[in-house]
Amino acid sequence: MAPDLAQESKFNYAAHIRYWRRNLKTFLPHHYTGNDANRMTFGLFILSALDVLGDLPGALSAEERQGYIEWVYNCQLPEGCFRPAPATHFGAGRNEENKIWDPAHMAGTYFALLILIVLGDDLQKVKRREILLWLTKVQKPDGGFGETLGENGVVEGGTDSRFGYMATGIRWILRGSLEGPVDGVPDIDVDQFVECVRASESYDGGISEAPYHENHAGFASCAVSALHFTDRLPVPKPDGRLRGVTNLQGTLHWLASRQTLTLDEEDAIDTYKDETDSAATCHDAHSFVKLRSYPSTAGELSFQEKPTSHFELGWVGINGRINKIGDTCYAYWVCQPLQLLGYLHIIDRKPIRRWLLDRTQHVVGGFGKLPGDHPDIYHSFLGLMVLSMFGEAGLQNADAALCITSRARRHLESLPWRRELLGMSGAETSVQNPVGSYVSMSGG
């Protein structure tokens, strides 16, 4: 049955507060056991979610807040950077031989810094120089970044833009978008990183893990965010600096095309070996959209060949790849780069909001991946971030690139040491959106 468009979908504020406080104050369900090494990531999601909800002051006492800050610093390594969880902390037993099993970690460092910012720390105890030097060591010859350093300084980890996003995010937190050596510390090779992003851009504007791979909204989001942090997004007038997103109109079209009416598993049918499966039509997915119900009453009338005027869709999901089902997390991975590029307005937020609130919002709070799924920390946080970007009443404004509130970002930008560092070169403390209304969607 289609949604009643006259009935406003409701964000269950109280349930979300309870959900996130439970995640903060109690043991997580056993399903999270295999993610013990990701505690720093979960910590950021939980604390930032409470901040977005405006509940952080009420959820934490001053003593608890300080305790979490100390917990994060306990994960800082002697040589700089952070471990992603206490599990690899050897304490006094750590030595030159076994420290390879307790390495500096890209995600651990990025999320540790963000937690400290959300909690109002001044980052004075962060080994900033050591972290910035480490970033130059984990940059690969092609310009991308790894996850950690292995034996003999070999860069290890994936090859996609997630690590570039976190590396440039760390760099922006600690030194802004200044280029070149700062305070005697060398910089990463920004031009080479931009080349790496450009090489992963596809013919249709999407961005993939690596050249000639399948486009993916998550990689597009991370790449656009990294270009945002390095002030290398496209600008109306070339300024001589190498910039990414070389086909802006194509990228916007690809992102906007991730809107879908395939909202759950029952909306698709397997066509493998049926009459539609021929040499001309065969592909790897073997599925077509099947709507059990229509997105609106007017849509059903239109399908039955009855004349209708333009109608508003009831629910619209967002997927991350072509021919995939709508997924809560991809609402963030698509809307976030659109906002950073200055084009969030090219999608209709209303049916996306209804999809999130009517279909994936859970009765106990949080969001599931798909309709009917239990809520989890990852999807619940990203769903909340999307609603904040949409201006949901009762939610704090979010900084889409950093995944924290605008309040937390202002705290970072107010820190005296950072203002002094950036002022030394006359740099601005904030990265502004350089794209504006650079491109028209007509002809896309």
Question: What are the residue ranges of the model-derived segments?
Answer:
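Preference for long, amphipathic alpha-helical scaffolds in soluble/luminal domains
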Residues: M1-G444
